[in-house]
Amino acid sequence: QGAQAQGHHEDSRKRVEMSKGCCCSGGRSCCFPDPERRRIEIDFLYLDLSACTRCVGADASLDAAIADVSTVLKAAGFDVVVNKVNITSKELAIKHQLMSSPTIRVNGRDIAPDVKESPCESCGDLCGSTVDCRVWTHDGQEQTVPPKELIVNAILREVYSGAPRQAQDAGGYRLPRNLEAFFNGR
């Protein structure tokens, strides 16, 4: 009984010592804050979500990919931030260095850096001109909508690489003629 009382006394003393200088009575979250969580930032840049079938499809694929990986990323200590940016002007296209619509970037890196395009009827109808939109190459096939698997793999590649967020180099960007034609026709 004496040893048990002494153990209880030591536990009480440890709690008191832990609480010195803390904002609470020794709760772990107060005295020992959680380590800083890492962040995965996903940018979805698009021209139109009302008529462009490629932008609408890319948005749906991105949402499905995020739904599939977000629980695992959270458990691994990552916060996922998704920025959906409607590029409505030349100025916004230049600011975000848009090469083609739609674009998905993970921590500043395009998920498909080799940009390929084909004529997009829906965007052509929007601006009254011939406009090309992005096509995605996955498993050797070109698709007008990025497959969920392509997006998930890009997110996981970024998580496992541990590389810092890629900064945009403003000096080398020039608004592509295709986007210029889109905004001039709008």
Language-model region placement:
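Non-globular targeting/processing and membrane-anchoring segments
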Residues: Q1, E10-V81, I94-M99, V106, ...
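A short acidic/basic microdomain associated with nuclease active sites
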Residues: V81-I87
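Short, solvent-exposed loop/turn elements at beta->coil junctions and helix N-caps
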Residues: I87-A93
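Ala/Thr-enriched low-complexity intrinsically disordered regions
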Residues: A3-A5
